[in-house]
Amino acid sequence: MAPFGRLYSFMPNGRVFKILAAATLNGLEIEITPYQHMVDNKTPEFRAKFPAGKVPAFEGADGLLLPESDAIAQYLAQSGPYSEQLLGRDAATSAKIRQWISFFDGEVYPHMLDLVIWRVGIAPFDQSTETKALARLEFALDVLEKHLDGRKWLVGDELTLADLTGASSLLWAFMHIIDASERKRFPSVVAWYLRTIETEEVKEVFGPPNLIDVKRVHE
């Protein structure tokens, strides 16, 4: 069977895991195209398909061209037998799922990225950015901790795209920032995160848990 579509992105990309997880649940084969960031996305051929030059970007076997990770994840979530589970079985549930996706996009991922990029050598360290980003990430984790207390999943009683988006947004945070001492502060978040990435149907996408013991600090 031919792939459902192809994905353009550098790997690993924290915005891609939710896409591949949704595709895997729905039994959709996605081809990961060989890609060199800041080279391939600047070519005339790429810009003709995706004028903004952003990745991830999706090209469907039917010719659909779709940038923006949340849009791609939603499209793949809606394109198979798990669509109602992933996106909600009624309007209220769908809205709640969208609420949490927006939360991770605005309140988690940008601050996580600020904390990670200097630790992996992509950007120089800046103390002001570090302080603000850590405070914002811990605030978001506190919101999540309170919501997840007594809950198995973010919305309702089954895995949804909100959970896949959340786990994707926090994957690098657990690898580089949320160390053992932090994890003690947010036990419900940790339990939910592990439950999500260890779900049988998607665990190959996320890989085994990679939890940092002590986060790197600038000297």
Swiss-Prot record:
InterPro entries: EF-GSTs, Glutathione-S-Trfase_C-like, Glutathione-S-Trfase_C_sf, Glutathione_S-Trfase, Glutathione_S-Trfase_N, GST_C, Thioredoxin-like_sf. Gene3D superfamilies: 1.20.1050.10, Glutaredoxin. PANTHER family: ELONGATION FACTOR 1-GAMMA, ELONGATION FACTOR EEF-1B GAMMA SUBUNIT, PUTATIVE (AFU_ORTHOLOGUE AFUA_1G17120)-RELATED. GO terms for biological process: translational elongation. Keywords: Transferase. This is Glutathione S-transferase-like protein LUC7. Residues 3-84 form the GST N-terminal domain. PROSITE patterns: GST_CTER (PS50405), GST_NTER (PS50404). The lineage of its organism: Eukaryota, Fungi, Dikarya, Ascomycota, Pezizomycotina. Belongs to the GST superfamily. Glutathione S-transferase-like protein; part of the gene cluster that mediates the biosynthesis of the mycotoxin lucilactaene and the lucilactaene-related compound NG-391 that act as cell cycle inhibitors with potent growth inhibitory activity against malarial parasites, moderate growth inhibitory activity against cancer cells, and no activity against bacteria and fungi. Within the cluster, LUC7 and LUC8 encode proteins which are not commonly involved in the biosynthesis of secondary metabolites and are not essential for lucilactaene biosynthesis. One of its GO terms (cellular component) is cytoplasm. It comes from Fusarium sp. The keyword Transferase applies. Its EC number is 2.5.1.-.
